[in-house]
């Protein structure tokens, strides 16, 4: 048994036990039936505190701790959440040289992980692409115009049916920008919304529809899952998740499919302890 593994047992497992005993668990609501909740602490929390996506076999997560200038991309097995691999501080030099230090809500498409990246004095919002097998950056870095992303880019989601990538700013906006991943991230249009969205932490497509994880704090411990109708521009709340503790931060989300239907997985961040991966029936 290695020295580092012994340290992990000595320090992490007691922390995990304390967390499990003291942390209130999320509960089901009329619109969000909880299936399971798993807690990850310390080193694993560092690599999964922002975004989550999957390819059916693996979950891919992103982590950012700006206080210690740490970023990460990681891989876990779908079904068991067993750790597979991670890449600490994976951003390419062109990003780190200009101060990029934040990876947001990520999205998987066609063997690649698309990551929204921001940070630095001039924000420098961009999409960085990683190889899903190796977790290494592919060298593809697509800068986004500062006039469209003055406050950065917190999330992106790729429609697996078209290869189009969708993204918006963090603050209140009525526009979602659309890019073609198969054409050098060309900006091909916008989705104009009837009502503004804000504080979107992650998003994913399910059967051609875009769903988003929102972290507004105006409903106590309730965190909303939104649905966007591209044709009408309507934005609606399809699930109200009760994460019990109003100080927790809702982060990224993804869907998996099985014989029993689709399951929604959402990251909820307790910054004092770690990450909860909360899973719900996607009956919407």
Place the predicted regions along the sequence by residue.
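Loop/turn-rich, solvent-exposed surfaces of beta-rich toroidal or solenoidal domains
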Residues: 195-230
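Beta-strand-rich domains and repeat architectures in extracellular enzymes and scaffolds
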Residues: 41-71, 102
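Repeated scaffold domains used in trafficking and secretory/extracellular systems
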Residues: 46-53, 96-105, 147-158, 196-204, ...
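Surface loop/turn motifs at the tips and blade-to-blade linkers of beta-strand repeat domains
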Residues: 40-45, 88-90, 94-98, 142-150, ...
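Structural motif
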Residues: 68-75, 122-129, 173-179, 219-227, ...
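Blade-loop segments of beta-propeller domains
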Residues: 81-110, 114
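Short coil/turn segments that connect the beta-strands within blades of beta-propeller domains
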Residues: 56-57, 110-111, 161-163, 207-209, ...
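Beta-propeller domains
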Residues: 60-90
């Amino acid at each position: 048994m290695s020295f580092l593994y012994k340290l992990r047992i000595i320090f992490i497992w007691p922390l995990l036990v304390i967390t499990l005993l003291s942390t209130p668990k999320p509960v089901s609501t009329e619109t969000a039936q909880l299936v399971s909740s798993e807690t990850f602490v310390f080193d694993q929390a560092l690599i999964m505190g922002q975004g989550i996506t999957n390819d059916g076999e693996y979950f891919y997560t992103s982590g950012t701790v700006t206080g210690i200038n740490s970023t990460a991309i990681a891989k876990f097995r779908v079904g068991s959440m067993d750790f597979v691999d991670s890449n600490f501080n994976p951003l390419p030099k062109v990003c780190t040289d200009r101060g990029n230090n934040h990876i947001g809500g990520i999205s998987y498409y066609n063997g690649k992980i698309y990551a929204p990246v921001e940070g630095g004095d001039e924000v420098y919002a961009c999409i960085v692409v990683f190889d899903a097998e190796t977790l290494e950056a592919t060298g593809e870095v697509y800068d986004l115009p500062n006039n469209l992303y003055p406050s950065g880019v917190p999330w992106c989601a790729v429609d697996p049916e078209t290869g189009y990538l969708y993204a918006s700013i963090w603050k209140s906006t009525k526009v979602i920008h659309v890019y073609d991943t198969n054409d050098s991230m060309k900006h091909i249009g916008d989705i104009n919304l009837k009502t503004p969205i804000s504080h979107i932490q992650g998003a994913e497509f399910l059967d051609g529809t875009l769903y988003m994880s929102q972290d507004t704090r105006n409903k106590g411990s309730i965190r909303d899952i939104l649905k966007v109708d591209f044709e009408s521009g309507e934005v609606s709340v399809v699930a109200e998740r009760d994460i019990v503790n109003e100080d927790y931060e809702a982060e990224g989300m993804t869907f998996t499919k099985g014989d029993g239907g689709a399951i929604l997985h959402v990251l909820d961040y307790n910054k004092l302890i770690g990450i909860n991966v909360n899973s719900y029936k996607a009956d919407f």
